[in-house]
Design a protein with these regions (language model features):
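Nucleotide and nucleotide-moiety/phosphate-recognizing core
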Residues: 60, 68-74, 78-112, 144-145, ...
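Loop-to-transmembrane alpha-helix initiation sites
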Residues: 138, 154-162, 175-187
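Transmembrane alpha-helix interface/packing and boundary motifs in multi-pass membrane proteins
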Residues: 20-24, 105-115, 147-154
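Cytosolic, membrane-interface loops and tails of multi-pass inner-membrane proteins
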Residues: 31-66, 200-211
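Interfacial segments of multi-pass membrane proteins
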Residues: 54-61, 87-90, 107, 121-151, ...
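N-terminal signal-anchor transmembrane alpha helix
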Residues: 10-36
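Short, non-helical or kinked segments that cap or interrupt transmembrane helices
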Residues: 38-50, 113-126, 153-161
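Short, small-residue-biased leader/transition segments that mark boundaries at the very start
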Residues: 1-3
Length: 211
């Protein structure tokens, strides 16, 4: 049986669908609506991610904003991890695990429940990286934390942290454990692509800080 046959077994396809659908759950949107009564898709950057949840809710309830922001980060990261861990427990190949990771990030960024709108993919990407390439992911998280504290610009900090993950994975692990680094690059590309509006605002000097 060729590798493509193994890649597209019935059980694998079910995992791929589950990864995308679970990744599509818009936790930031749901939390902000439930606990703050606001629709983050209609305010701020209109993203469903933690940064926009924090920014929008902070306007009326700063203490709640921090709690919802943290909860959004954690839930967005966890939703990328859940299907991965189940697949790992069943002995799925690294190629299959990376496909699941890519689809989880795609689900967050292009949610099936929101007309294929979504967030920027940072927390979900970090979640899957922590499972598949933990040390590079931890380095990237540390770089992100440092940059966030110094620069106070979420988008820039996230992208710098993401680049740190990629560089660390290449040098520490000699890649991601499969024949190609393509899955890691695809996730990186998706996240960068979703940040294009932020990059444009940054160039114009209009990107907001999150303090």
């Amino acid at each position: 049986m060729c590798s493509s046959d193994l890649f597209f077994t019935n059980s694998n396809v079910l995992f791929y669908i589950a990864a995308y659908l679970v990744g599509s759950i818009p936790f930031g949107l749901l939390l902000a609506k439930q606990f703050a009564g606001v629709n983050v898709q209609e305010a701020g950057s209109k993203s469903i991610g933690a940064t926009n949840v924090l920014r929008v809710v902070k306007q009326t309830n700063p203490s709640l904003a921090k709690k919802l922001g943290i909860a959004t980060v954690l839930l967005d990261a966890i939703k990328g991890v859940v299907v991965l861990l189940i697949a790992m427990s069943m002995g799925m190949s690294q190629e299959t695990l990376w496909a699941i990771a890519v689809l989880a990030v795609l689900g967050h960024c292009y949610s099936a429940y929101l007309g294929f709108e979504g967030g920027k993919g940072v927390a979900t990407g970090l979640g899957v990286f922590l499972v598949l390439i933990p040390m590079p992911a931890l380095i990237g998280a540390a770089v992100w934390g440092f940059c966030a504290k110094v620069l106070k610009v979420s988008s820039v900090s996230s992208l710098i942290g993401l680049v740190a993950v990629v560089i660390a994975a290449i040098f520490m692990n000699d890649g991601v454990g499969v024949d190609s680094n393509a899955p890691m690059y695809i996730i990186t590309f998706i996240i960068f692509y979703k940040h294009i509006p932020n990059i444009v605002r940054l160039i114009k000097g209009e990107e907001s800080k999150v303090v």
